[in-house]
């Protein structure tokens, strides 16, 4: 029998021999695995001014032993990594400690997750909802057996990714992604008075959606429910974030392996009222999945923004250059502050440890050599923002021979990755609403690039793996650029 100490020792040994910190593609201000593979953000919570980011973690990748990794930060920019918090060391999670969330309860924090077990002889899957507790966020105690031992009747064992929160009436609620026996996706709601005995309330329904979500893909993963205030109206709305597998809407976008969408309404009981069947993709880039909202604690600032992290990765796409160069793969997005604007989700980068400052352009975009951002010369990890007005297209060039092409004009964003080392490259075009290209913010952190347009109304995340040094940034084209600000992280 393998003991917990053996699982921990294996993970720590893999970390001790890691090449990742020496890899020039390893990010400086994005959460990335100390070694091996990272995927979904898990258990995000801020306690006492410290931000805790847990994550799906396979330190011995490609050996498929899934732990929860653990990183902390005081400023969301500099991250410290700790020993794995959840080990796959019991029957209930022998085939992986899968995704979940965190909640503060009195003097301790509970990490809720899905335990995955697959019978080695029959291949039959067991999915259970499990909990780990901690009073200091350094030592973690696992409860055995699992709290919810199986899925309700009418659903397959694709029953996972619990989000747990305290409702306004003092009870606790849980939201889970599920697959019905007819192989369609849904979200289930549970309720409890003590976090240990749960009653299934039923599926979340959409009475005003005209059946739009009744057979919407074959599985809903990573559901998150978050309440956001609309900047235009001051009205608070509930936003359901889901990753529906198996949908192919006949419209622009939805080009990744699986999408991530937001549905806006008002949760009353199990009904998301006012959701009319419309939905939006949260990120139009090549790499974005399994986002999670960060939970608050009693010590959290009530005026602090609602934060979201995403996984900058896709299912089944682990063939990134960093596997060869550093023995690691994937990372998080930067934290994003969420609001609504006229019923649409707005996401702005939130990096208090990397504040923008006024920057200088050397030359003008219309010059033959373009305009270089003086403060970012030689930098491979930076943040840049500016306003633009267009008479033609504006090109953003990172380094001189990076192979990455970002082109903006009044109605379109074009990102061409075909010249980079990114294996799932090619060219992606995003149609923009009027005025969205007038405000631009770009985060570039060695091998990940995030583009924010329209003050957060359009977001594009991609892994870039540039050619050559990929240092500094130059703006060129028929556009006027003003209000430039920047900061380097290296």
Give, region by region, the residue ranges found by the protein language model:
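Beta-rich carbohydrate-recognition and catalytic domains
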Residues: 1-161, 166-215, 229-283, 301-303, ...
């Amino acid at each position: 029998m393998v003991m917990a100490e053996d699982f921990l020792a294996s993970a720590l040994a893999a970390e001790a021999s890691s090449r990742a910190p020496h890899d020039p593609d390893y990010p400086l201000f994005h959460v990335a695995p100390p070694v091996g593979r990272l995927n979904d953000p898990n258990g995000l919570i801020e306690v006492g001014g410290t931000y805790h980011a847990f994550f799906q973690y396979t330190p011995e990748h490609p050996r498929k032993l899934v732990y929860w990794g653990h990183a902390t930060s005081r400023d969301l920019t500099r991250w410290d990594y700790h020993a794995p918090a959840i080990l796959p060391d019991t029957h209930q999670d022998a085939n992986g400690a899968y995704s979940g969330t965190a909640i503060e309860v009195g003097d301790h924090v509970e990490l809720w997750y899905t335990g995955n077990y697959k019978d080695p002889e029959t291949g039959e899957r067991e999915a259970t909802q499990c909990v780990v507790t901690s009073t200091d966020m350094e030592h973690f105690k696992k409860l055995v057996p699992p709290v919810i031992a199986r899925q309700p009747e009418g659903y397959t064992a694709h029953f996972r990714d619990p989000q747990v929160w305290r409702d306004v009436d003092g009870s606790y609620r849980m939201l889970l992604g599920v697959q019905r026996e007819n192989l369609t996706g849904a979200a289930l709601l549970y309720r409890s008075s003590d976090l240990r005995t749960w009653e299934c309330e039923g599926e979340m329904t959409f009475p005003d959606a005209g059946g739009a979500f009744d057979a919407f893909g074959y599985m809903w993963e990573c559901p998150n429910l978050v309440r956001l205030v609309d900047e235009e109206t001051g009205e608070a709305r509930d936003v359901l974030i889901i990753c529906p597998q198996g949908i192919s809407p006949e419209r622009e976008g939805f080009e990744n392996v699986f999408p991530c969408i937001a549905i806006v309404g008002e949760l009353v009981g199990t009904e998301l009222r006012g959701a009319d069947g419309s939905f939006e993709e949260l990120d139009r880039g090549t790499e974005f999945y399994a986002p999670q909202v960060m939970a608050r604690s009693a010590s959290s600032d009530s005026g602090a923004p609602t934060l979201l992290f995403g996984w900058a990765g896709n299912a089944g796409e682990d063939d990134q250059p960093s596997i060869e160069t550093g023995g690691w793969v994937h990372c998080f997005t930067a934290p994003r502050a969420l609001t609504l604007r006229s019923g649409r989700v707005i996401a702005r980068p939130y990096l208090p440890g990397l504040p923008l400052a006024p920057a200088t352009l050397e030359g003008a975009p219309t010059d033959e050599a373009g305009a270089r951002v003086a403060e970012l010369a030689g930098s491979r990890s930076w943040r840049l923002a500016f306003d633009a007005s267009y008479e033609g297209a504006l090109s953003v060039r990172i380094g001189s021979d990076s192979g990455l092409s970002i082109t903006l004009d009044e109605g379109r964003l074009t990102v061409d990755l075909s010249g980079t080392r990114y294996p799932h490259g090619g060219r992606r075009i995003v149609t923009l609403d009027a005025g969205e290209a007038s405000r631009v913010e770009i985060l570039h952190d060695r091998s990940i690039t995030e583009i924010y347009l329209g003050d957060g109304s359009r977001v594009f995340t991609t892994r870039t793996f540039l050619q050559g040094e990929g240092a500094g940034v130059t703006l060129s084209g028929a556009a006027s650029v003003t209000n430039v600000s920047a900061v380097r992280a290296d």
